[in-house]
């Protein structure tokens, strides 16, 4: 993260004035809409498109070059792509991301474990983060995810991944907080934490164009969400973290405060850099600023897989305009973390909180 600080001013200028022209540092690639779950908070599996082939991904990654710092592979269920290992290999060889993040529902345990091990081996200079999606405990999780036995399969996958002994592999658990589980969140957190994941993260269920959930009542009330997040933050504050984990948790606490503020005030609390520093490629090659709006900046197929041809196009500028003018707001975690990195105020607050925590720990030991 430290190496990103010198680029802050450049990205602020890109957002405000359109120059210098910069590539995204945070890129999400949705490799498929197909999914073997039927979640109550997501309808993405209903979308039918002609997915990018491995060759098309390779051409796109070649055109991107080594600009991407954080690469997220999402779906649908990414591990329904039998060529997921080759997609990751191409991304690593062409883009050299420092972080490759993959989300999974954990259903295809053996294939996921085998694939992740190969991805880790093929990407020695990248940190590989695999997050298992777990929204409830036992049969309640199966009900939310629409698959009988999903909970047991997810835990089997978690244990298998956790047994892999690689220094560049992090295995976490991710919970979507929705109206279907918010009342039970403290128990969910305590139970899942027993498995000692490398990280535990949450995100609020949202109406997203990408997920086909516009107009659906899936989110908890603001009061319910705030109560759940306040509980989580207290638990995080009472745990001791060192090194990079301390920095990560400090940013996470800051994000949860930011998410609450955005939902309360219904505005961009921090300037949003979606479409500037972060972007998403859909399974059919459309480039979006973000998955909430899912407005196409252009079609990579029609652009000959030339990322910059789409990214610096007039259509891309038109998609960025309402974001720059703060005509939208959301607590989308992926975009929010990069927004926080572009805010000197937020960075100062994070460092202040880390220092205060260190002083408190020192005084407690004394």
Describe each PLM feature range.
Residues 31, 35-36, 53, 112, ...:
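Generic structural signal for small/hydrophobic residues in well-ordered secondary structure
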Residues 123-284, 288, 292-302, 343:
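Radical SAM enzyme [4Fe-4S]-AdoMet core and its adjacent flexible, acidic
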Residues 1-24, 240-264, 336-366:
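Alpha-helical membrane-targeting segments
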Residues 269, 284-366:
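Flexible mid-to-C-terminal extensions adjoining Fe-S/redox cofactors in radical SAM and related proteins
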Residues 2-127, 220-224, 343, 366:
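Conserved alpha-helical substructure of the radical SAM core
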Residues 20-30, 255-261, 311-321:
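Short, intrinsically disordered, charge-biased short linear motifs at domain edges
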Residues 35, 39-42, 77, 272, ...:
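Short cysteine clusters
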Residues 41, 45-48, 278, 296, ...:
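Secreted/processed peptides and extracellular or luminal domains of membrane proteins
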